[in-house]
């Protein structure tokens, strides 16, 4: 077992890893146990009682965080020329089509989200092997394949994120930064949980939300008391 650093020991001394905490308390505690020199991300991990191998139990959704992610999301819009100016005006970082497809094929991936249009998906679809494994492939369910690219850009910049359960039945997503106030972290995390609660598959049996953990980059995970979250 790796030896704990002084900072890790300090963090662990501030809470009991065997206890569960209310979401409100955890949102404040996460700021106290994070010692990174940079503004670390705050993440939530929710273990669900679903079988992702079954198509009718694949949990996927979209949530707009009330206070955003705290991250400057880099957006590429792949669109026809008539929509290019709208995308730029909405705040897209990169706008184009064939030129950016070639850049991506050449290894360029300096982006966080790609938004495109149904009419050009035939071209974008050829990038599936590159974008798919990196979770960058545009998807209609995520709102990133749309005719209204300007609205999609604004939504993403405002804190709209999409998530899906992984093969282990866990949903992992960011709910802000350590620099956020406890109230901002709480409200963002609660929004994710409320959206997840509404997405319970009809075919899922037993306990739906099995565990919730709040953590930051490099920090220990704080177990959340599910009873502290209304609607679960």
Swiss-Prot record:
Keywords: Repressor, Ribonucleoprotein, Ribosomal protein, RNA-binding, rRNA-binding, Translation regulation, tRNA-binding. One of its GO terms (molecular function) is tRNA binding. GO terms for biological process: regulation of translation; translation. The keyword tRNA-binding applies. One of its GO terms (cellular component) is large ribosomal subunit. Gene3D superfamilies: 3.30.190.20, 3.40.50.790. Signal peptide: none annotated. InterPro entries: Ribosom_uL1_bac-type, Ribosomal_uL1, Ribosomal_uL1-like, Ribosomal_uL1/biogenesis, Ribosomal_uL1_3-a/b-sand, Ribosomal_uL1_CS. Disulfide bonds: none annotated. Binds directly to 23S rRNA. The L1 stalk is quite mobile in the ribosome, and is involved in E site tRNA release. Part of the 50S ribosomal subunit. Belongs to the universal ribosomal protein uL1 family. This is Large ribosomal subunit protein uL1.
């Amino acid at each position: 077992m790796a030896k704990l650093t002084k900072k890790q020991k300090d963090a662990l001394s501030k809470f009991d890893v065997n206890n569960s905490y209310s979401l409100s308390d955890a949102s404040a505690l996460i700021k106290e146990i994070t010692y990174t020199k940079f503004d670390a991300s705050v993440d939530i991990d929710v273990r669900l009682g679903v079988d992702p191998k079954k198509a009718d139990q694949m949990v996927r959704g979209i949530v707009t965080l009330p206070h955003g992610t705290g991250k400057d999301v880099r957006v590429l819009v792949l669109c026809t020329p008539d929509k290019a100016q709208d995308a730029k005006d909405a705040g897209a970082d990169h706008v184009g089509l064939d030129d950016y497809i070639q850049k991506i094929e050449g290894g360029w991936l300096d982006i966080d989200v790609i938004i495109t249009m149904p009419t050009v998906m035939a071209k974008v679809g050829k990038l599936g092997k590159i974008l798919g494994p990196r979770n960058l492939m545009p998807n209609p369910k995520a709102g990133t394949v749309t005719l209204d690219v300007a609205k999609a850009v604004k939504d993403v910049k405002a804190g709209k994120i999409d998530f899906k359960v992984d093969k282990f039945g866990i949903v992992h997503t960011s709910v802000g930064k350590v620099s956020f106030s406890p109230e901002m972290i709480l409200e963002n995390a609660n929004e994710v949980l409320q959206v997840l609660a509404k997405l319970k598959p009809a075919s899922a049996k037993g306990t739906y939300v099995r565990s919730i953990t709040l953590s930051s980059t490099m920090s220990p995970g704080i177990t959340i008391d599910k009873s502290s979250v209304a609607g679960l």
